Amino acid sequence: MTLALRPDQGGFLRPFGCGWFIREFMLGHGPEDSAKINPDAGTCQADIFYHYKLALHRAYADDAVAWENEERIRNGKPIYTPEEYQERFEHLLSRIPYKLTKCRYHSFQRYFHWLKQLGWVGLTGKEEPSSVQEVMPDYDDAPPRKYYRLTRKGKEAPDYEWSNPQLTLYPERGRDYFREKRRNHHYSRRKPTKSRKT
């Protein structure tokens, strides 16, 4: 018996998960060619988000060049040389608008807040002035950039919990609750776009 493989409705397809990226970044592994940090010194939330978005852009550009290579194979043309591949990658990467990929800072902030509630990330005690404080020194209420690092609990948490911290934090809701929420959400219809083949 064969099962049809198809994605579930709703949600966004991503080459890698947000939780996985945050954990690997804060461990200092530099996931998806991002910057490597000192895990003991930690990093601030805005920097993690910035590197996550750039990594998503690189993954999308790489997928687009791989798609072009597949088209070249189908059309009987030779695949890109490594130099041509890199050139196409850089070209496509430069054309991706910053807000094209789906993650927005508010969503990331909520996700990070769940990690704080679970006790998986904690403050290091280091703070630095935020850009708002630098531009408007008279604005005392502007929050500083606070540095976070992974806690022992966060390092020991399994992958499935990192992939859905909201479900880990609120297990009483269960997957059926989230399925029902998605079912009741009315996604807007997209206008048809041009095919890549034309």
Locate each region found by the language model:
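Amphipathic alpha-helical dimerization/coiled-coil segments
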Residues: 149-198
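Short alpha-helical segments that sit at the start of domains
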Residues: 1-83
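Short, cationic-aromatic polyanion-contact patches
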Residues: 126-159
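Generic anion/oxyanion-binding catalytic loop in active/binding sites
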Residues: 33, 37, 97, 143
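Intrinsically disordered, low-complexity acidic Ser/Thr-rich regulatory segments
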Residues: 78-106, 140-142
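Short acidic/His/Gly/Ser-rich catalytic and metal-binding motifs that mark active-site loops
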Residues: 61, 82-89, 130-133
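Short amphipathic alpha-helical interaction segments
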Residues: 99-118, 122-126
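Short, solvent-exposed secondary-structure capping/transition elements
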Residues: 33-35, 61, 120, 124, ...
